[in-house]
């Protein structure tokens, strides 16, 4: 018996193949989004933009490395996204970073509404025949939300989507599925974040760059401070003024086992020898740089 209605409700459960297991976000992306939010138009409640990055071969891990804002007009009735601007910026970005692709989009608002679903489907839709892809199809589209409201805590969330709704409303309907993410936190990033956060209490908000020797001195002082904290903790545990922690004790034993058993005088000789080698390498590198600079200037002479 044939049914007379043409309305079909689509309910697609997100599969493990279409949803990435993990999303890695570079801190520079979050700083860029916060910077974009300060230039928000008065007519719009949020800023949206394109997320760029790389995918693993199986598509189950996405690394978000950069982003750019995309102009749009949003009202209570409709939303207009300037996809030509998105196309031009993406092609310009490919000239500097040819390996990065579109992995999704971001918004400076935690709200998910029909317009969010419309933009999500726009980024996830396949390209027109004969044109270069500008979205994430056939891979899942990542939606990153950053709550930039100064009256609320900074909240970061990532989503992928699954189609849901009747046939006539598939373009502006989808179910956002939360996806786990991590923010990259390696040594280089941590050093940069410390330099950026250093002038947070300074009214001028100016951060000064340190020389290699100054940075070495700061790192040495931080290391001495951490050693003093560990020494005080161990002494307090021995005296019985602080409770013992088995996990901390095992971690300290593991760290101490990695330290070579060297006398103080021998260690000073080894360190001095290593420091002299480093200074020689730096001197030779500066000499070579000077020679190359002189040679390039001599080649310009008639």
Curated annotation (Swiss-Prot):
SMART domains: JAB_MPN. Residues 23-165 form the MPN domain. It is found in: Cytoplasm. One of its GO terms (biological process) is translational initiation. It holds the Pfam family JAB. One of its GO terms (molecular function) is translation initiation factor activity. The keyword Cell division does not apply. GO terms for cellular component: cytoplasm; cytosol; eukaryotic 43S preinitiation complex; eukaryotic 48S preinitiation complex; eukaryotic translation initiation factor 3 complex; eukaryotic translation initiation factor 3 complex, eIF3e; eukaryotic translation initiation factor 3 complex, eIF3m. Keywords: Cytoplasm, Initiation factor, Phosphoprotein, Protein biosynthesis. The modification Phosphoserine is found at residue 162. It comes from the Eukaryota. PANTHER family: EUKARYOTIC TRANSLATION INITIATION FACTOR 3 SUBUNIT F, EUKARYOTIC TRANSLATION INITIATION FACTOR 3 SUBUNIT F-RELATED. Component of the eukaryotic translation initiation factor 3 (eIF-3) complex. The eIF-3 complex appears to include tif32/eif3a, SPAC25G10.08/eif3b, tif33/eif3c, SPBC4C3.07/eif3f, tif35/eif3g and sum1/eif3i. This set of common subunits may also associate exclusively with either moe1/eif3d and int6/eif3e, or with SPAC821.05/eif3h and SPAC1751.03/eif3m. The eIF-3 complex may also include SPAC3A12.13c/eif3j. Component of the eukaryotic translation initiation factor 3 (eIF-3) complex, which is involved in protein synthesis of a specialized repertoire of mRNAs and, together with other initiation factors, stimulates binding of mRNA and methionyl-tRNAi to the 40S ribosome. The eIF-3 complex specifically targets and initiates translation of a subset of mRNAs involved in cell proliferation. Belongs to the eIF-3 subunit F family. This is Eukaryotic translation initiation factor 3 subunit F. The gene is eif3f.
């Amino acid at each position: 018996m044939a049914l007379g209605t043409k309305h079909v409700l689509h309910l697609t459960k997100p599969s493990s193949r279409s949803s990435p297991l993990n999303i890695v976000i570079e801190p520079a992306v979050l700083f860029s989004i916060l910077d974009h939010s300060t230039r928000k138009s008065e007519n719009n409640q949020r800023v949206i933009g394109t997320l760029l990055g790389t995918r693993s071969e199986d598509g189950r891990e996405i690394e978000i490395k950069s982003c750019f804002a995309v102009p749009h007009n949003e009202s209570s009735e409709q939303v207009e996204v300037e996809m030509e601007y998105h196309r031009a910026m993406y092609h310009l970005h490919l000239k500097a970073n040819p390996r990065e692709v579109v992995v999704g989009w971001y918004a400076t608002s935690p709200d998910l509404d029909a317009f969010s679903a419309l933009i999500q489907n726009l980024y996830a839709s396949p390209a027109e025949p004969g044109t270069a892809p500008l979205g994430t199809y056939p891979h899942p589209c990542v939606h990153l939300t950053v709550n930039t409201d100064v009256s609320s805590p900074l909240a970061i969330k990532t989503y992928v989507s699954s189609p849901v709704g009747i046939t006539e409303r598939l373009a502006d309907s989808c179910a956002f599925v939360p996806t786990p993410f991590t923010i990259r936190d390696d040594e280089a990033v941590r050093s940069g974040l410390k330099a950026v956060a250093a002038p947070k209490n300074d009214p001028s908000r100016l951060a000064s760059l340190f020389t290699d020797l100054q940075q070495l001195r700061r790192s040495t002082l931080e290391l001495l401070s951490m050693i003093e904290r560990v020494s005080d903790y161990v002494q307090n545990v021995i005296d019985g003024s602080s409770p013992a922690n088995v996990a901390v004790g095992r971690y300290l034993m593991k760290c101490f086992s990695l330290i070579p058993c060297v006398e103080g005088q021998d260690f000073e000789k080894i360190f001095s020898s290593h420091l002299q080698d480093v200074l020689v390498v730096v001197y030779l590198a500066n000499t070579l740089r000077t020679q190359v600079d002189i040679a390039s200037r001599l080649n310009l002479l008639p």
